[in-house]
Structure formats: C-alpha cells, structure tokens
Amino acid sequence: MRESGILMPVSSLPGPYGIGCFGKAAFQFVDFLSAAGQTIWQLLPLSPTGYGDSPYQSCSAFAGNPYFVDLETLEKEGLLTAADLKAESWGKDPLEVDYGTLYVSRFAVLRKAYAAWRSQCAGLHGCAYYYPDDYYAFTLANEDWLDDYALYMALKAANKMKNWVEWDAPYRRRDKAALAAFAAENEEEIGFWKFVQYKFSVQWQAVKAYANEKGVQILGDIPIYVSADSVDAWVGGKLFELDADGRFARVAGCPPDYFSADGQLWGNPLYDWAYHKKTGYAWWVRRVRHALGIYDLLRIDHFRGFDTYWAIPATSTTARTGKWENGPGMELFDALEAALGKPPIIAEDLGELFPSVRKLLADSTFPGMKVLQFAFGGGDNEYLPHNHVKNGVVYPGTHDNTTLTDWWENGASQKEKATAAAYLHLTSCKPTAKEVAAVKTAAARTALLRAALGSVADRAIIPMYDWLGLGAEAHLNTPGKLGGNWAWRAKAGFDSKALAAQIEAECVVYCRCNADVQNVK
C-alpha cells in the first residue's frame, strides 16, 4: 500500500515551556496527520539529548528524553502548580529551543514534581513510600536498563555531570561494593531518575495509543552507535572496544561525503562485533525489542555500518584518517528475526555505498531511502525519481539536509537547479541561466514535493517545514557543526485545517492517503 507521512520532531512542537513535549500539541498534531490523510509520524530519537544537544549523542540507548514530559499534565496530577511553572525561564524565543536554559528550568521543575509525588506516596499502606501499581510494573518491566541508568545519572549528578571516565576508579570500574554503598546513600536521587522515566513512558504511550487509534503509525529512529559518555558504554564493557577505564584507540564516524569535506568525526565507541556474535547479539535484541515497545516502525541510522564501518584513530582531529572495517552483516538481522520476528526496519542507506552494502540491503529486504536533494548533480543519478524502487522510502530531504526553500535559494548549485528545473518541467529541457533564475522558489518546492509523492516508492515522508515552506531558520542539523542545531520550533497554529486539506489533496492525487480518505476521494 502506498503511504505518506510527515517528519516532525517532538522537540519542534509548539508550547509554552521551551520545547515540544507530550502535551496538547502532540495530540493536536496527531489530529492534523489524520485530517491530512497521513499514516506515518516520523520522529527523531526520543532519547535524552547529549553532546551538542544531539539526540544521536545520548546518555542512554534505552531511556527517554526528560524534556518531553508534559508539565501541564503533571500540574493536573497535583505534582506542580501554576506558580512553579511561572517561576522558571523557558527561553526568549518561542520558535527556538534554548537548551542551556532548558537544562536548568526543566530539571528544577521535574524535581519539584518528584518531591510532590513522594509526598503523595508517603505513609501509604503502612510503608514509608508506597508508589502506584503501574510504577512498580514499569520498573519491573524495564529493570534490565532502568536500574543502571538511574544509578548512572545519580553518579553523574554527584560528579558535577562529568564524563564517567573522569569518575573515581571504584565508580568508573563499577566496583560492586562502592556502587552498593552509593546506591544506599542516594536512594532518593536514584528514585528521581526512575520517576522521570516512568512519567515519560506513561505520557508517551498515551500519545502513541491515540496515534494508532487514528490510523497513524509512529516511525522512530535508532542511532547505530551509543555515546562515549553514556550508561551503555559504562555498563557495556566487552560490548565495545574499551578498556576498563573507558579509553579507546578508535572511534566511529564516516568518511568525507556530500555533507562534509572532512567527513564526520562522531567520537562514539565502536562495537566489538566478535563479542556480540558470541552472545547471539543479545544486546541488540534487547535494544530493538525495547524500541518496538515505543515505536511501530524503526529507522536505523547509518545502516551501512552493519556491513562496513569507518574506524578512526582516537587522536585524529578529522575523519579523513579512518579505515573501513567489516561489520556483522546478515548475522545480526538473522538474530533479530529469530528472536523478534521480522522487524519493521527502514534502512538509512545514504552515503558512500559499496556493492556489499547494497547486497546487505537486498538480503535483508529492508526498504532503503532516496533523497531528492541528492538527485540533481547530473547523469543517471540513483536518487532521481525514475530510479526509485517500490520497496523504499522517498524524502525531499532528511533532518541533515536543509529545507527545500533554503536548498533552492542557497544550497543547490546552478547545475543542480538547472537539472532539477528541466527534470521537473519547470523550464525547457536545456534551460538557459535566465530561465532557471525565473523559476520561483514556491514553484520549485511544490514540484519537488510532488516528485516525492509521485515516486514509485511505497512510502513518502515529507518534513513538516517543507509543507510549511520554511527557509534556513528551520534547518534542523548541519553535520559537523557544533551548536545551533536541533533548535527549530513551529509556530502555534502551524497545523491548520487549511494546510491539512492541502496536504490531503496533494496526497490523494498520488494515492498516498489513508484508505478511508482515498476510497472517498
């Protein structure tokens, strides 16, 4: 079945408290998607943001982002007051996330909510604290990661949020006696981090259930790597190329490509794939199983890294000096299927692709991705719509691309614009520079959107900012740039009935709306 969806980060939803969250705006956006005939809501990772405010550099592969907990829901539960919310600063610009301000204000308010929650639970049933049954169910169901995560975050708080490799040796090396003593002395702090994850889970599951009731699937995102400063690296040990003190000789990244002339030096620890194989890829099975409890569909970032990955000396200042190493290949995906059934994975197969990567994608039968902003460099480019395949997902651009408006006005070369203009019937087949210059941005954007929707690919995902026609102000991420990313927020009222009707009309033409809408139209 042909489908279409919208890429819209939770962080980009409007609201009064500095960042999008699981409150009214999330439910309203689901209503908007349904009204527009869309069947997919694609998200960025819901994990806590880390270095550079990136959701791809998280302190946990399993935890949720505390910033997404809806504060107004906590207020309704009696855990916060209006005065609590007014007492904090939430940033100067409602259209941009101020992560520095948010770090201070959000956690201050969440700690007030936790204190109120503990007060509500104090002395119940003759216990010092008796928490709700669903809290105990949540902690039990997630104990394989939650206990370590909460302990890790409490230790970070006690160590002024330093990287775990800078902690004292007993904690860095996970000495059992030292950790047990710390946990006993910091029970309340550890409980805070569990409380936040509990509220995250309850609120997110309500949003997801509502979306599913409306016929909208949630497409989540799994970064291939974990952060060096993460509970996963601290606990993982033999899963990664680390010694007991967290030192590593090589780190992850990717070679020079369209996005960066120096490549991308991510700095993540590399997996010890030989050890993963010995365990039957148990950690990856746990990770994907957990993700399938949060999302309906999974986009796995940097799919090519499962075939061959770029290993960079830790002392390098750019990614140019790396070398290719072999990944686990189909063995990993066979293990996932044996444990979980065929996982609903979409492979992010962008970048330099060896024939072996293409074979892995074919063997896995996962749909890959096509990005129109890469299509117009000349020749019979694989990203041109006539080269798309049915088992695929087409995008005008991803979160790493700029918006269509900014691409046409500032990003595309003259050759790309001329090629695109001719291909999209905006000019003659061999346009002059004057013809290309006469093409209006709005016309180019509409033509590119329709090219995506008209693709033979089963799924088309359009970023929300491209439906809105926004420019560089909505560019989510510039790879290789530290700071100033992941900040865009939509204006209140962006998800209007008029825009929903426009999107529905466009998608009906290309038979991409949900079945109810398509059959009526």
Per-region residue spans from a language model:
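Conserved, well-ordered alpha-helix/loop/beta-strand core segments that scaffold catalytic motifs
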Residues: 193-226
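Mature N-terminal, pre-catalytic/accessory segment of carbohydrate-active enzymes
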Residues: 1-37
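Alpha-amylase-like alpha-glycosidases and glucanotransferases acting on alpha-linked glucans and related
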Residues: 9, 18, 53-197, 226-461, ...
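Structured C-terminal cap/extension of enzyme domains
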Residues: 469-519
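Catalytic domains of carbohydrate-active enzymes, especially glycoside hydrolases
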Residues: 24-49, 294-295, 452
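Outer-envelope exported proteins of Gram-negative bacteria
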Residues: 44, 217-219, 223, 297, ...
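Surface-exposed amphipathic alpha-helices with a cationic face
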Residues: 34, 204-212, 337, 361-362
